[in-house]
Amino acid sequence: LDRSSAASDVYKRQLYNMAGKDRALADAICAAVKESAPGAVLLALSGSEMVKAVQAIGLPVANEVFADRGYRPDGSLVPRGTPDAMIEDEDEAIARVIRMVTEGKVTANDGTDIAIQADSVCVHGDGPKALAFVEKIGAALQAAGVELKAF
């Protein structure tokens, strides 16, 4: 097992995506969290099986949306390495975040609008412009009248 940071990130990402689709896995994760950290707020892909599992077990959940990722019509993320997986244009990504937060909608990669709940916005922090991007998103959300707060 490769325990490097990059490999660890891949495994976490895979587990996150798997738990978003597999209710039994999501239930197992929630049970472990409830036992070890009962006050923790779990982040889960908006509308996913993980959100349903967290709600069912009675833990606090934050529906997570992604600023710079494409969505499929079923609400899952477009897999990395495929067309439409990443939103490269910052202005487009910011506009999508504003719409997700204020209207509860995002346009999927087939052009349809899907319902989404945005309690938390994920921004990938591995790029050189990540902090500036987060600051722009925060300013745009505040300009749209959205209150930013910790949970």
Residue ranges and their predicted role:
Residues 1-7, 11:
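Single conserved hydrophobic/aromatic residue that forms the stacking wall/gate
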